[in-house]
Amino acid sequence: MTFRATILVTAAFSLLPPLLCYAAPRVAPAQAVPHAAAGATVTWGHARFTVLTSRLIRMEWSADSHFEDRATLVFLNRQLPVPHFTKTSDANGITLETQDLTLTYHPDAQGQFTDKTLQITLKGGPTPVTWHAGQKDTANLLGTTRTLDGSSGSHLKSPMEDGLVSRSGWSVVDDSQSPVFSVSPKPVVRKTVVDGAWVEERTTAPHQDLYFFGYGHNYRQALTDYCAVAGRIPLPPRYAFGVWWSRYWSYTDQDLLSLVQQFHENSLPLDVMVVDMDWHLNEDQLKKRGLKDLSGHRLGWDGYTWNSTFFPNPTAFMAQLHAQGIKVALNLHPASGVQSWESAFPDMVKAMNMPENTQYVPFLITQKNYAQAYFSVLHHPLEKQGVDFWWLDWQQEKTTPIAGLNPTWWLNYLHFTDQELQGKRPLVFHRWGGLGNHRYQIGFSGDTISTWESLAFQPWFTATAANVGYAYWSHDIGGHSPGAIDPELYTRWVQYGVFSPIFRTHTTKNPEAERRIWAYPEPYSDILRTSFRLRAELKPYLYTEARKTYDTGIAFNRPLYYDWPEENDAYTMPNEYIFGDNMVVAPIVQPVDPKTGLVQATLWVPPGQWVERSSGKTYTGPTKITQYFSLHQTPMLIKAGAIMPLEEAVSGQSAEPQHVIEIWPTSQKEKTS
């Protein structure tokens, strides 16, 4: 049984969510203290060891004995309270011992870290665990990958990267090739992204730079400490947890305003309007003019000039959306640079000090003059017109002139920093660029194939990204291609989307690819409407859990083994995950039996008392339950005793919704089977 209480919004209460959820500035390169605290480092020959926590040790070897104290792309802040540790030495080398680890270094003539010269033993636990330098981690719990483009299920273009946690009890991050942030000789007041810290290559001298995480199965502490040295996971703006509309289509401004009106007429919430590539001059229009993209990329995929045929008055268009509480995002493919037909082209040529007869400004994002103009000439004028944030789509290249720097990573950093410098709550919507990108929140997972296999893969994939601190994957709900989607599959995808970090529908430019939920027949349309409204109701809960993510470094959408690491079943239920501290969700990812209209699903009930939402039955775990679910049901467990903040579903942010407290009391008579 659940109890709901509607709270009348008063002036005092309306202040409560911001007070609870305001996130202090994250640790950024310009704010970090990359030098370790005095007493944390031990140097031995060509090696230096930095004891960051009792379970996290940095290990450096340098042929010329010059060690790196600047922030890298991944590790920014090494000045932590120094844990107690001891150092002993003899003719063979040294031993460092913390409360949890014992490090032994017996260098050979070169001193490099090898399986014979460096080892670390984890204390405690039923059996000792010893790591040797260079050892492969065969039990790593994985992290994430750059993109799901073209994937159907687990068939990926690029493999999953290792995570920071492992059933082995340890993981190692090799930071040897990571670029560094420069250090200004004197304090700098940052007004633009090029002021102060800037990216530089590492030394070319032979070196090793490793970070050993020896946390056993305390995965939560591993991620908390990782975020202490690598920067926090920023809290997205509240609107990001609502309903996003996105579709690749040649919309006009009137088409989109009509679409918003249809949301209102159907009493459906809408918080974010994403406008895909046709907001700017598109491929068909440019081909008719006989133009060619001199970057070599696809014509019309990038642009900074409004498509006046579709958007004759973009400022007025975005003002109308803002008046209804709807935020606006525009799509970009920045790697194309700036072509000669762009309205901003003359100003870019001037800003780059290029000749007047220049035909094309290439994408030179690692050069300060380009980065400065990229924002001041190309983006800020559009933001003044009303653009709230940018969808930075696929970056065709993976390298830059700076060794080890991926342009995706660097763009994420620059866009986030630019918003901070403008005093905004930053929001970046882009691809995963690699370790350290957890600081630039929302990931676009790419163009998946609309299959049951794709849907079935996403719950595991999304939760697993917690292992590198990447808390906010956004998927194309319904998949991207090829076109029409089975109504049942779309319904189940939307139901999963409700219980994912970001709720965003999308599809390719195909008239048969329908994402308007009122266009579907019953019973699908009614179930889809219920799901959209449920997502809006969950915003206070999600925002609260996102604040916890900021505070702890532990993603609210995470694998079961974070909270129950010694329960084997927590590792064997790939479709089941934690969704905030009070919920465990296991979305249906297969079709119902056409004869019964039901599908069988098994849930693992974690230790403690839990209420199965659809039946209202209370179970005490650990145990497994198997039952049948209809199309309108999503398997879900609510922690008994949970008090969950919710709100009524309204469109946008212009209307103040009623706040609701939902209480799930404990049961005196526990259902165990």
What are these regions (language model features)?
Residues V9-P18:
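Bacterial N-terminal signal peptides
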Residues C21-A23, A30:
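Boundary at the C-terminal end of the N-terminal hydrophobic targeting segment
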Residues V27, L52-A91:
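A low-complexity, Ser/Thr/Gly/Pro-enriched, surface-exposed linker/loop concept
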Residues S89-P237, R247-Y248, V260-E265, Q627-V650, ...:
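Catalytic and substrate-binding clefts that recognize carbohydrates or anionic sugar/phosphate headgroups
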Residues F241-R247, V274-V275, I326-Q339, L392-Q395, ...:
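Aromatic-lined carbohydrate-recognition surfaces of secreted/lumenal glycan-active proteins
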Residues F416, G436-G443, F457-F461, A465-H475, ...:
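Catalytic core of carbohydrate-active enzymes
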